């Protein structure tokens, strides 16, 4: 039955859509998104993907319409605060913070304006798409202000005379700079997250959710890890291990042609920079290979 299938909401378009789909595919979920279809059925698992607007996803989870959802923490918290203020259901379970979709919600002001802290915003009119997050921050700071609610092109509000400042999502700051603005205050940091509805699941759905979570953990660990192979002086093994924090102890094998050295294989959770490789070389390591890992399960 259709209701027995796991229903996952993902953003139809936008910054999180491609990466959410890519993560599911890396977890072995086969599907094909075509055209304007709003529901996509997995080819190999009892999973349905619902392609919806990002600001609809928290509500679908909180109302129990879907089982799981990929959403930015900024959008999730904005909707939660809004629904809480309206007395609507706003509960969910955060299953896993993901390693993509990083951004921050920041207050930006005219690039030539002096800024000493939130108190400088007292009495200002601030344009934003996130009124609840802005209000929560300003209320906590004890700063009175007024909101100019916009659904897009927030950065042009000061030049258009609509507002004195803005509160908008920032990734690099290039858009702010192009519009004569500068970042003054970070009010919320966000990444993509996987959330789940409140309530019980039957055994099959619960098992499938746990399987997906285990695979997601493996995908994320693989991204953060490297498989390293090198030859090392046997007497310097402990010093070399200290440079390469690993998931487990390394595999150490004798070399047939050189009894003074051993072959070392390990998975390192540390980013391996050129400086680290140079330090390894100084310790006598040679034939150093650093390889990416596609999948990983401990």
Swiss-Prot record:
Residue pairs linked by disulfide bridges in the UniProt entry: none
Pfam family, one: HisG
Keywords: Amino-acid biosynthesis, ATP-binding, Cytoplasm, Glycosyltransferase, Histidine biosynthesis, Magnesium, Metal-binding, Nucleotide-binding, Transferase
GO biological process, one term: L-histidine biosynthetic process
Cofactor(s) needed for function: Mg(2+)
A cellular-component GO term for this protein: cytoplasm
Keyword hit for Transmembrane: no
Residue intervals passing through the bilayer: none
Enzyme class, broadest EC rank: transferase
Annotated control of activity: Feedback inhibited by histidine.
Enzymatic reactions: 1-(5-phospho-beta-D-ribosyl)-ATP + diphosphate = 5-phospho-alpha-D-ribose 1-diphosphate + ATP
Main location: cytoplasm
Annotated compartments: Cytoplasm
Molecular function via GO: ATP binding; ATP phosphoribosyltransferase activity; magnesium ion binding
The protein's annotated pathway: Amino-acid biosynthesis; L-histidine biosynthesis; L-histidine from 5-phospho-alpha-D-ribose 1-diphosphate: step 1/9
EC number: 2.4.2.17
Family stated for the protein in its record: Belongs to the ATP phosphoribosyltransferase family. Long subfamily.
Stated role: Catalyzes the condensation of ATP and 5-phosphoribose 1-diphosphate to form N'-(5'-phosphoribosyl)-ATP (PR-ATP). Has a crucial role in the pathway because the rate of histidine biosynthesis seems to be controlled primarily by regulation of HisG enzymatic activity.
UniProt protein name: ATP phosphoribosyltransferase
Lineage of origin: Bacteria, Pseudomonadati, Pseudomonadota, Gammaproteobacteria, Vibrionales
């Amino acid at each position: 039955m259709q209701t027995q299938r796991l229903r996952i909401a993902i953003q139809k378009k936008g910054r999180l859509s491609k990466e959410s789909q890519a993560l599911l595919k890396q977890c072995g979920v086969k599907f094909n998104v075509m055209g304007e279809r709003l529901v996509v059925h997995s080819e190999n698992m009892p999973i349905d993907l619902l392609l919806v607007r990002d600001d609809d996803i928290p509500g679908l989870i909180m109302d129990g319409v879907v089982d799981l959802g990929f959403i930015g923490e900024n959008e999730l918290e904005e909707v939660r605060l809004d629904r809480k203020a309206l007395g609507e259901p706003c509960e969910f379970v955060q299953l896993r913070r993901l390693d993509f979709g990083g951004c921050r919600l920041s207050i930006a002001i005219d690039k030539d304006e002096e800024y000493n802290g939130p108190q400088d915003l007292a009495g200002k009119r601030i344009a934003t798409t996130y009124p609840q997050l802005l209000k929560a921050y300003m209320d906590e700071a004890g700063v009175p202000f007024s909101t100019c609610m916009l659904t897009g092109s927030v950065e042009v509000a000061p030049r258009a005379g609509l507002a004195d400042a803005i509160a908008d999502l920032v990734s690099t700051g290039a858009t702010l700079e192009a519009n004569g603005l500068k970042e003054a205050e970070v009010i919320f940091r966000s990444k993509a997250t996987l959330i789940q509805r409140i309530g019980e699941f039957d055994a099959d759905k619960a098992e499938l959710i746990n399987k997906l979570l285990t695979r997601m953990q493996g995908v994320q660990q693989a991204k953060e890890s490297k498989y390293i192979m090198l030859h090392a002086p046997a007497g310097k093994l402990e010093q070399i291990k200290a440079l390469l924090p690993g998931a487990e102890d390394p595999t150490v094998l004798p070399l047939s042609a050189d009894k003074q050295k051993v072959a070392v294989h390990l998975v390192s959770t540390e980013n391996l920079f050129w400086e680290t490789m140079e330090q390894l070389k100084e310790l006598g390591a040679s034939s150093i290979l650093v390889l990416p890992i596609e999948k990983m399960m401990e």
